[in-house]
């Protein structure tokens, strides 16, 4: 029997990428159009919400048209419309939500609301089918979370950052090093050229929880650089980057594998913008091997680690099957989060 073809038009506009995708049956990308705003925000050293919103207004219709054309489909072929409604920048989110609602209304299509962070996790569906229970390490500019999924569509935060997210720490360190925004890719490159000579702190590494903290590392890094400036000492940029990244990766890997062992999960999904970091990818793979864990490590391709509409379509396919739909009064929720589970 031929599988029924479900085509979802998916919108992502939570931060500084406008993306529209057409996804078939939750696992095949027919189109994934992304309009990035990085150059517009680089001179500010970070994302300016008002600038981001204006760019989304300019790009959302163009991206929608291009996504449909690349996929070779029309509105009449669609099964549903999906959209990120949080977390993110409220003005940016509203552009995508408004566009999705307008199309759903005009073409009498179901509207599927998607948590942006769930989208990052479900990007792994483009690599292989997910098996539950699984553990996801979510690392981005705004989040550093360990998420336990006992089943499809069920998310429980078991570890979170107490202060800065990992990606946020990378960008702040990048400003100190004089690296253009976004700094993660360049710091990762420099780290592979240097050595861990500064031995920066590994916060909360030995504490009996799965939470993270990167503010102490950030402060130690900044103080080291400022002290060197005051005494006229020149520090090796590659060694600084390597020392910073070694601290971040060791903490992320240690806590993640500790959780995976406790929960006896089948798969470990690495998701979010920082999932593109080669140091983190290498560290997790090496950690799993050295610990002798029977754990399937799933990492989306680099092009799907950042914000994109395809991941929203993958998540929406699950939500649609579970009849998780929204009315036309759907609104943006900038602080949207998963439920918390404090004890393993």
Swiss-Prot record:
Binds 1 Fe(2+) ion per subunit. The keyword Mitochondrion does not apply. Its EC number is 2.3.1.234. Its cofactor is Fe(2+). One of its GO terms (biological process) is tRNA threonylcarbamoyladenosine modification. GO terms for molecular function: iron ion binding; N(6)-L-threonylcarbamoyladenine synthase activity. SUPFAM superfamilies: Actin-like ATPase domain. Keywords: Acyltransferase, Cytoplasm, Iron, Metal-binding, Transferase, tRNA processing. Fe cation binds at residues 116, 120, 307. It is found in: Cytoplasm. Substrate binds at residues 138-142, 171, 184, 188, 277. It comes from the Bacteria. Pfam families: TsaD (PF00814). CDD domains: ASKHA_NBD_TsaD_bac (cd24133). GO terms for cellular component: cytoplasm. The keyword Methyltransferase does not apply. It catalyses: L-threonylcarbamoyladenylate + adenosine(37) in tRNA = N(6)-L-threonylcarbamoyladenosine(37) in tRNA + AMP + H(+). NCBIfam families: gcp_kae1, T6A_TsaD_YgjD. Belongs to the KAE1 / TsaD family. Required for the formation of a threonylcarbamoyl group on adenosine at position 37 (t(6)A37) in tRNAs that read codons beginning with adenine. Is involved in the transfer of the threonylcarbamoyl moiety of threonylcarbamoyl-AMP (TC-AMP) to the N6 group of A37, together with TsaE and TsaB. TsaD likely plays a direct catalytic role in this reaction. This is tRNA N6-adenosine threonylcarbamoyltransferase.
């Amino acid at each position: 029997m031929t599988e029924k073809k479900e085509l979802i038009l998916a919108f992502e506009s939570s931060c500084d990428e406008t993306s529209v995708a057409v996804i078939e049956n939750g696992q095949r990308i027919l189109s994934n159009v992304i309009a990035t705003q990085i150059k517009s925000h680089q001179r500010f050293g970070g994302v300016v919400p008002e600038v981001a919103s204006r760019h989304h207004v300019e790009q959302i219709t163009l991206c929608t048209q291009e996504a449909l054309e690349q996929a070779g489909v029309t509105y009449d072929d669609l099964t549903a419309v999906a959209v990120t409604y949080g977390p993110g920048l409220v003005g940016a989110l509203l552009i995508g939500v408004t566009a999705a609602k307008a199309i759903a209304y005009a073409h009498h299509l179901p509207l599927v609301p998607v948590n942006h962070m769930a989208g990052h996790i479900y990007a792994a569906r483009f690599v292989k089918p997910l098996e539950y229970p699984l553990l996801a390490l979510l690392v981005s500019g705004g989040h550093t979370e360990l998420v336990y999924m006992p089943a499809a569509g069920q998310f429980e935060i078991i570890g979170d950052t107490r202060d800065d997210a990992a990606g946020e720490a990378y960008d702040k360190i990048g400003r100190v090093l004089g690296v253009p925004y976004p700094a993660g890719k360049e710091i990762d490159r420099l780290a592979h050229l240097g050595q861990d000579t500064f031995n920066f702190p590994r916060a909360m590494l030995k504490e009996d929880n799965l939470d993270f903290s990167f503010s102490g590392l950030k402060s130690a890094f900044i103080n080291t650089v400022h002290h060197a400036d005051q005494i006229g000492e020149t520090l090796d940029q590659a060694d600084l980057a390597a020392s910073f990244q070694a601290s971040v990766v060791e903490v992320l890997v240690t806590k993640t594998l500790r959780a995976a062992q406790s929960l006896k999960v089948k798969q470990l999904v690495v998701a979010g913008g920082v999932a593109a970091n080669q140091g983190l990818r290498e560290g997790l793979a090496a950690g799993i091997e050295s610990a002798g864990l029977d754990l399937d490590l799933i990492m989306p391709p680099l092009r799907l680690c950042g914000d994109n509409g395809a991941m929203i379509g993958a998540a929406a396919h699950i939500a649609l099957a579970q009849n998780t739909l929204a009315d036309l009064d759907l609104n943006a929720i900038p602080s949207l989060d998963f439920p918390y589970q404090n004890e393993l």
